[in-house]
Amino acid sequence: RRYRMSSDSILIVEGIHGLNDALTPAIPESHKYRIYASALNPLNLDNHTSIYVSDVRTLRRMARDNRTRGADAEKTLTSWPSVRAGEERNIFPFQERADVMFNSSLLYELHALKRHVQPLLEQVDRDSAVYGEALRMLDFLSFFTPLADTYIPQNSIVREFIGGSCFD
C-alpha cells in the first residue's frame, strides 16, 4: 500500500525488517533515525560461561509462540535454524546502520521465562531430533529460579512474550 506523507510527518517502521532501506527508498537518509532493539543479555553463568544471546531469543520466541500460536517447544526448536538463517540474511546486515541500539534484555527475564518454557521443554519427546537441544535448554534454565508473573510489571517488555501486557 502506498502512502503520501506531508513534510512534517513522522513515519515509524516497526519490526524485524525496519532497518532495511528497501522499505523506505523515497525517504532521504538525512530524514531517517534508526533504532535497533535486541536482547543483549549482560549476565554470565560464571567466570567462564557466558549466556548466549541466541538462547535468550529462542526462549522468548518459545514462550510467545506457545502463547500466541499454540506452538510447542519442539516446533520452535525445529524452526530455529531457519529463523537464524533469516536473521543472518535480512536483519544482521542492517543492524550496524542503526543510529542507536536499545538493549531490551532485563536482568529478571530468564527467571520470568522459566515458568513458561520449562514445562514446554520437558514435553519434547526423547525420539525428537531436537531432544538434545531441549535438554541443553533445561540444563541452562536450572541456573534460574522461576519468577511468578505477579512480580513482573504489566509494562515490562517480558510481557510481550509471556502475556499480560498493559499494551495488549
Where in this protein do the model-derived segments appear?
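Structural recognition of the conserved hydrophobic beta-strand(s) that form the central parallel beta-sheet
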Residues: 10-14, 36
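Conserved NTP phosphate-binding and transfer environment spanning the P-loop NTPase/kinase superfamily
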Residues: 21-168
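Short beta->alpha connector loops
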Residues: 16-19
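ATP-dependent small-molecule kinase phosphotransfer cores
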Residues: 1-11, 71-80
